[in-house]
Amino acid sequence: MADSNALEGLTQALRKLPGVGVKSAARMAFHLLQHDKPGALQIARALEHAVNSVRHCTLCNTLTEQEVCATCANPQRDRSKLCVVETPADQAALERTLAYRGLYFVLMGKLSPLDGIGPNDIGLQKLFDRVVPRDEHGEPLPPASREVQEVILATNFTAEGEATAHVIAQALKSRGVQVTRLARGVPVGSELEYVDLGTIAHALVDRR
């Protein structure tokens, strides 16, 4: 690495991106500083703007610049269906299929006891309160009076994703909620954002 604290700092910052190792980070840093300084400044400005402007939707947790995201605010969406995903990237993958017109809840993660990630870290209580709201006396509304009639579990088909889906399903079924899971057309061990759109669409249609 060249004798530059600034260059080293940029390289270390780029390494924070998923899948970027030492060599890739150094290559990107050299390219930006040697060949594309205007592009580097554009990236810096865009990143700063996004960090300062983007927040979590108060209803579904996805990333948005508004208090409520465009999907949750859209009156044309089917509010009786709620699809639970791990990340905004998974939500985007489902949206691209054009096969789903309901609403979403983004966990922003998955259960992983080995990493110290438990139910409170991924907002499970917020999900349960969304699906099974309570009346003015603090009692759960009966199934027929709830807005959400079906919860579709679209967590990834990894060990952690399956465990997360199982915990959510058990909790919601005990509250009288209809819970379905994406069909097994999605390969085991895969993440939704990397699965082709046709496969995701079929998994949605064939959910059970």
From Swiss-Prot:
One of its GO terms (molecular function) is DNA binding. Keywords: DNA damage, DNA recombination, DNA repair, Metal-binding, Zinc, Zinc-finger. It holds the Pfam family Toprim_4. A zinc finger (C4-type) spans 57-72. The keyword Ligase does not apply. Residues 80-187 form the Toprim domain. GO terms for biological process: DNA recombination; DNA repair. SMART domains: TOPRIM. The keyword Hydrolase does not apply. May play a role in DNA repair. It seems to be involved in an RecBC-independent recombinational process of DNA repair. It may act with RecF and RecO. PANTHER family: RECOMBINATION PROTEIN RECR. Belongs to the RecR family. This is Recombination protein RecR. It comes from Polaromonas sp. (strain JS666 / ATCC BAA-500). The gene is recR.
